[in-house]
Amino acid sequence: MVVGIAHYLTVSAVLFTLGVFGIFLNRKNVIVILMSVELILLAVNINFVAFSAALGDLVGQVFALFVLTVAAAEAAIGLAILVVFFRNRGSIAVEDVNMMKG
C-alpha cells in the first residue's frame, strides 16, 4: 500500500476541522484557543509539504519551515502574555481578557 497525497490531505483536513471546532466550541479558555490555532497551522503545513513532495518542488517545504518558526514564536509570546495576565488578574478567561484597557 502506497501512501499518496490523498492520505496526507485527509489527515490535514481532520486536523484543520479539529482546530476549527476547538475554536468555536470552547470560547472560555484562551490556552485551548491557542492550541486550536496551532492545530490549524499544522494542518496547513501538512498541505504545504504534501503538495511540495507531490510536485517535486522544495518551495512548499521551505515555506512550511517558516510557518513553523512563526508558529513557535507566536505560541511562546502568547503563553508569556497569558502568564503575565494570570499573575496580575488571577484568571485567563476570555471574558476577563476582553475587559482589558488599551
From Swiss-Prot:
Its EC number is 7.1.1.-. It catalyses: a quinone + NADH + 5 H(+)(in) = a quinol + NAD(+) + 4 H(+)(out). The chain crosses the membrane at residues 5-25, 31-51, 66-86. GO terms for molecular function: NADH:ubiquinone reductase (non-electrogenic) activity; quinone binding. Its main location: membrane. It comes from the Bacteria. It is a multi-pass membrane protein. Keywords: Cell inner membrane, Cell membrane, Membrane, NAD, Quinone, Translocase, Transmembrane, Transmembrane helix, Transport, Ubiquinone. Pfam families: Oxidored_q2. GO terms for cellular component: NADH dehydrogenase complex; plasma membrane. InterPro entries: NADH_UbQ_OxRdtase_chain4L/K, NUOK/Mnh_C1-like. It is found in: Cell inner membrane. It is an enzyme of class 7 (translocase). GO terms for biological process: ATP synthesis coupled electron transport. NDH-1 shuttles electrons from NADH, via FMN and iron-sulfur (Fe-S) centers, to quinones in the respiratory chain. The immediate electron acceptor for the enzyme in this species is believed to be ubiquinone. Couples the redox reaction to proton translocation (for every two electrons transferred, four hydrogen ions are translocated across the cytoplasmic membrane), and thus conserves the redox energy in a proton gradient. NDH-1 is composed of 14 different subunits. Subunits NuoA, H, J, K, L, M, N constitute the membrane sector of the complex. Belongs to the complex I subunit 4L family. HAMAP family: NDH1_NuoK. This is NADH-quinone oxidoreductase subunit K. The lineage of its organism: Bacteria, Pseudomonadati, Pseudomonadota, Alphaproteobacteria, Hyphomicrobiales.
